[in-house]
Amino acid sequence: MKEIFAERFKSARLMKGFSLQDLANAIDGKLSRQALHRYEKAEVLPDGDTIVLLSKALDVNPDFFFRSTKVELGEIEHRKLSKMPQKTASIIKEKTREYLSRYLELEEILGLVDRFINPLEKFGIVTSYEQVNEAANELRKAWNMGNNAIFNVVELLEDKNIKVVELYVEEDFDGLQTYVNGNIPVIAYNARKANKLDRIRFTLLHELAHLLLIFGDITPKQKETLCYQFAGAVLLPEKTLKAELGEHRNKLSIKELGNIKKQYGISMQAIVMRARDCGIINEHYTKKFFFLINQMNWKVNEPTDYYGVETSNRFEQLLFRALIEGQISMSKAASLNNQTLADFRKEYQLAF
């Protein structure tokens, strides 16, 4: 019991971004840094009143400290995480771990064993654009997507047994991917960018490329470029883009690009890069377009917005299935939903 508490206590502290001294200060010195250190080292188990005190300071429910669901994050390959302050990186990892511990515990309660199958497992080594373009087509075929627009990328990934974690963290973070417990694929993304859903969609599929593809002997920069190209190809297949723009073009209009963005949920800049990759426009015009983008200050805020839906209700559906079927109590449901019982009852009172 002490070991479980110690592990969860440290996770809650890191998730909050606190050092041991920060936590001691947050509880007005009611416990010293040394006393907190003993809890974290599993030397002592605090009493009930102390657990309540710590849970309030760390913004978790008291039973958070005693969840035993195993969540081991695999290697995290992320282009920005390694450059972040250690405190920020720890917050991201622990928030990811915390959400997954609740999700996986809920699946365990319901007896769900949904194994992930990588549709590109036998695709082979990837080193070129032509290969990622082909891989994107293979993925669409395996997942029965046709060549149409993807309505909801988050829901698509969850339906394919990839856990998607919504985080609210610093703006500089886009997303990450890893495997949990060795075989459960996970993609986390920054929901603070929710006002730019096209960027979230692109990030999710960029991270999906890292999950699904095996890359050859190429530089990290080349690998990132191929992941970007894969994301673009999944969102906007070559056949679809050529149907929209034609086989070859000398120029593109902002209106055309805006209409494609609104329909397919991909940024105008990514559409232009995709058009270049597909041979619709040449390199000279691509550079000319991006010069215009910079001149008009459209790099961050494009003149046309994409209004879509990027969410999944799978966790909520499982939660209420377990509750209605009597497999969990109301208080357990509140805990799994990371809420107090009072807040849970208030929010979902019309559901019963």
Regions found by a protein language model. Give the residues of each.
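Active-site hotspot residues in diverse enzymes, especially metal/ion-binding acidic/histidine motifs
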Residues: 1-352
